Amino acid sequence: MPQETFSRTACTAALLCCLCAWLCPPAAYGQDALLSAVPTANVISPAERDASCRIIYLGFVGALEPSQNKHSGVVQIGETLRGVDYPDVCAKSYSPYVWTDGLDWLLKHFPAHSGVLTSQELQHCPKVILVGHSMGGWAMLSVARRLRSRDIPVELTIQVDSVGITDYTVPRNVKTGAIFHARDVLMPLTTKHLRLEDASHTKMLADITVEGAGHESITRDPRIRELVMQTIASLRAGFAAPPIGE
């Protein structure tokens, strides 16, 4: 995307996010109770995680948020996954403005060469889950497309009230995808439905309008967390199963 177009899109999204936050504070949607329901997670050191990381959770917040915004459901999921119950998960969240930093962090867990990964290499690589809110939805799919160029699969992508010019098509390396959107002042700009680059490779799990949610509070919809946790549980079950033929 040209820098001028990116800047124009980012500024528009940022200004409208401000307006949305002012007109529709999260408390107005009755979802703030979800914040207190998220337990504080015990933290395992990054070095310990990197040594045993089998699943990567990479989240992107909205354009106006700090990457560690405690009110964002994207961040809250990551905090849970950094707890002692998930020693095999590496989880981080980033601003969409520095989405390449998130990509670089993710790729540190993969072979260093720049070419396509072989099936043998992928057997020893972590599984990837991507979640993005607002302009973070665009950032998330930008990461997925970069991974596609190396044949790195993505187990799950979730777009949450996504805002962006190139966030309509889910790339073929994504196995399952979902989109959640709200009815609020940003509605004219947010992505409502997705296209699949290759329907034989990608399955849409959810296309949901979250009633009563605003552009910020939608990130705390429990179904988003549930999709992430279900995917992790399924991946863990696959790790435990013996290879076919044994």
Q: Which residue stretches match the model-derived regions?
A:
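Bacterial N-terminal signal peptides that target proteins for export
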Residues: 2-14
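Serine-dependent carboxylesterase/thioesterase catalytic core
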Residues: 81, 88-89, 106-194
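Extracytoplasmic/secreted proteins, especially bacterial periplasmic and envelope-associated proteins
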Residues: 72, 76, 101, 105, ...
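Bacterial N-terminal signal peptides
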Residues: 12-24
